[in-house]
Amino acid sequence: MDQNVRLISTDFDGTLVAHDNDPVLDPACIELIGQLQQDGALWTINTGRSVELLESGLLDFEFPIRPDFILTSERDVFRPSRNGGKWEPFGNWNDRCAQAHAELFNSAQSVLTEIIDFVNRTTKARVIYLGPAAEGLVATSEEEMDRITEFIEQVRTRQPEFNYQRNTIYLRFCHADYHKGAALAELSRLINVPREEIFAAGDHHNDVSMLDGRFAAMPACPANAIDPVKDAVRSARGYVAEREFGAGVHEALLHFLNGNVLKR
């Protein structure tokens, strides 16, 4: 299917970056994204990393190209800084997001306390604090995290706006309205790119919100993606690649750009 890709939204770790592979980056994938940028497409990295951790990753893995925008911490929207520095908030989304989270954590103390008590009593997971506030969890295994998220799903029925973002053994507490998909939707609104011209690729739980078809009409995932991600991509009539990591992203981009170049 020949489609016009104007905005590319990619996860970072596990999608573009294959930590245990050599090379870590797929050269053909990076070259294609760079070529699309030269042709006028915009590329954003949509990640659970903070701005600082993403910048260190771009440096550590020697990315030869730069994203046009970054969506960080599974919620915030940044553009290149116009007044020194590398990045600045794009619009007032980040402020609105911070306010919503402050109000949520103030009103959801009983839910959060119950979750932390469950974690401390019944698991070996570690609670991560940002100052005095609990920000998230690190489990000892994915099976342990499965058990924790099952409990969270039970208790959050009392306060549905209390939610979480999960990636392997890591979990971040968050407002249900703010996630990778919502951040992508805000960016697309700000730069006036419709859903029909957005390609998105990811591999794990926290990527589902940008791969379920609501915010990107061209969702995709590499072969190393977990089954719930593959299911979401298939349900959205997207593309599940046969190759892993960046090679899979490259394969998916070619699928949408050139039709079925790589036969499934």
Give the location of each predicted region:
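Mg2+-dependent phosphoryl-transfer enzymes with acidic/Ser/Thr/Gly-rich catalytic loops
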Residues: Q3, C174, G181-R264
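Asp-based phosphoryl-transfer active-site loop
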Residues: N4-D22, L211
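The start of beta-strands in P-loop NTPase/AAA+ ATPase cores
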Residues: R6-I8, D68, I198
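Short, flexible loop segments at the rims of nucleotide/cofactor-binding pockets, characterized by
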Residues: H19-P23, G48-R49, A176-D177
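Active-site phosphate-binding/coordination module
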Residues: L25-K124
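Anion (oxyanion) recognition and catalysis
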Residues: Q37-Q38, R156, R234
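A generic structural motif
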Residues: Q38-L42, P160-E161, A216
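Conserved acidic, metal-coordinating active-site core of Asp-based
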Residues: T113-F199, H205-G213
